[in-house]
Amino acid sequence: MTSTPQRIASIAQSLDGDVQLATALCSATSLAEVGTIARAAVRQRLRCAGVTFVLRDGDQCFYADEDSIAPLWAGQRFPITECVSGWAMLHGKLAVIDDIEQDERVPTAAYRSTYVKSMVVVPIGGPDGPAAAIGAYWPATYQASRADLDWLPRLAQATSGAIADIGLADAPWAPNFRTRFPASAH
């Protein structure tokens, strides 16, 4: 992986000048580290109550990790067609849900035992399509700012580049994820 000053500056510019975040993503050496960096950035920027890092594994979504005020779904798998992270990956679009009770994409039964009332999920992936997602969650109905909704896809792109650079040898539980990220273009 090449962490040239020019590359870091380019990524930092796309992340509203956040050189520290760009440097951390460019320096990451494992998928777990990339997930930790991305989750921390989202939680800090969006001031949300929880963040998940989700990987696509064939027709399943694997909730690889989370940083949350209460447990959500870390370590669990769900059919890709039955969760919002899966919807974001399948459609390659940001899922913005101000009120989970009012959005048909939300499998409300999965949320009844959680604090989640609002969420935003951004897909992460290369040209072959998204193979990961980051979800941000709030305990009340919430509308994310336009600036934050514009920033999330840029973070997803930088995260995708970091994943492409490190490879996925440390992700044996997600064999289909491994082939989804070609070498980084940045």
Question: What positions do the PLM features span?
Answer:
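GAF sensory/regulatory domain recognition
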Residues: 39-43, 50-76
